[in-house]
Amino acid sequence: MQKSLIAASVCAVLAALSMPSQACFTVVVGKDASSTGEILVGHNEDNDRRIITNQYWVPAATHKAGEMIEFEASAAKIPQVEKTFGFWWTQTLSPDGYSFSDGFINENGVVVVSNNCNVTIEEKETFNEGGIGYGIRRIVAERAKSARDGVNIAIDLQKKYGYFHMGRTYTIADRNEAWQIVLMRGHRYVARRVADNEVAFLANAISFDKLDFKDTKNVLASPDIIEHAIEKGAYKPAKAGDYSDFSFRKAYQPEARRVLPRNKERVFTLLEMLTGREYKDVNDYPAALVVEKKISPQQVQSFMRGHSKFEKRLSGWYHETMQDICNIGTFDSVVYQLGADPKLTVVWRSAGRPSEQLYTPSFPLAGPAAAQSYMDPATATLAQFHATAQQLDYSADRAIYTFLAAQNFIDWMPEERAKFENVQKAFEVQAFKDVGEARANAARLMKVSETKALDYMHGFNVRYYDAALGEAAKVVNAANTHAIAVTKDALSKSDAGTVDVVLFAAKDFDATKLDPKKTFFGSPYPDGSIELNKEMAKPAKVVFKDVDGDGLEDAVITFPVKGATALTVEGVLNELYLFTVVDGKPTAAFETVRITK
């Protein structure tokens, strides 16, 4: 009976996951568990379909009386405070507008990231005035003086407006402490402070198990959190009046959420990396562990690059599903070293999947390089839920697309992956040395002039970003050596016909040795379940003929338009990739095509 109930719950969870979803993975290392004595926060932002990440510095601001905060069209309108802090904003720009993906660190060194933990018993709870979603993270970034202050701000907003998403865990951290707070649809919440000697970890299921609700220094919760679970039939104490066996995650979330492969495998991968022990039981671990050996920032980077040993990888691509910590939907990865002086905080960021990108150091309070965005913060804020086609267009002048192209080639071409891993190791060894020296120099300058120190750190940010961009460009230049041509200037999503794609031959490249069974054409972005685009077009026909008159036979590959345009965005200039194998060697190329209705 228990197995059938779990199976039914799994079906319900999978049905929920068929909608556009956001996932993520987070690791928090307490300062006493950290080799640097700093709180470390690692976070992978995992999303579906076409996502463009940009980095902004939003300056501190003074606001007019009566100003209202408006984000999602249906959400509550919230009064703005007089003064807001400056913050680094990682935007995940989506055609549909994302409420739950952006990351922040403000001028006080307060970090905000989150993990989707939906499917809870609170699905029918109500909220006020449309409730709050995106506003939680943005308002905490704007107003929080500390991590604890950020938690209190989130709780106050939850009480007043209520959360409109079914469930999510926010990690809010600063140089002194790290908190994780679960917000559920309606007005209930549970927050837990990560102990200084712990490593906390979280995929996409509620992690809090048994909590000491009397320990109000480290645990904060809605007053009726246990009684409500009893009323809902989600919890029955073994002994009446004795709540010592109360497990928050078991009461408020179906076990099916934790046993989903995408959730359990990522947690098990992290646990094995931490302990050397193989885990199999989803109820056999706490929300955090005390570790014997201190954890370094480099180790947190390796955690965020974690891959499941059970992933089969049979499709030709390295990343296929969400069972890896670093997976097909990882659009942004960060590791924060939260310094005693927030201005000297270091963040390591990859502009995509961290196993296929470089972790690049920067001092976030000194601001990003101009090339890390292509809009100003005010325009980007307006675009958050109203992005135009032009704002989502591919452009070689937008640096983010070079990083995305590099990882697309690396993912399909094992030879490029092997070469890149050597570059990655050398780059990051040097980066740790350089950022240590830069941090020491900035601390010296800070004693003379804060402005000079910030200018120095901003220069470091720009140079290291440019260096990482240069390495990504080298990958693209080395891998993207074969020309393709899509024979239509635009493709319609409603077209039931076909389109020809020409793969041109060269003196050292025999296109007639193309393997049709290992050839695909379409969008490289993940689907709505954060898995490989399985709708990508396969050849309907392949003809070899000399298209360009150079005496060499080119491959003219006919693809169904429906598959070629799957997961593309209407009105947008999309990049479409040809993934194939020629003479036994994985090969890829791309062209841009405007997609119409």
Residue ranges and their predicted role:
Residues 18-20:
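N-terminal signal peptide c-region/cleavage motif recognized by signal peptidases
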Residues 23, 479-504:
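Boundary/junction segments of secreted and surface-exposed precursor proteins
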Residues 511-536:
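Short, surface-exposed alpha-helix to beta-strand junction/turn motifs within ectodomains of secreted
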Residues 412-479:
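Histidine-centered catalytic/metal-binding microenvironments
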Residues 24-133, 153-280, 286-288, 292:
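A contiguous strand-loop segment
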Residues 494-495, 507-515:
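A short beta-turn/strand-edge loop motif at beta-sheet boundaries
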Residues 528, 543-559, 565, 571:
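Acidic, glycine-anchored loop motifs typical of Ca2+
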Residues 312-440:
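Substrate-recognition/cap regions that form aromatic- and gly/pro-loop-enriched pockets
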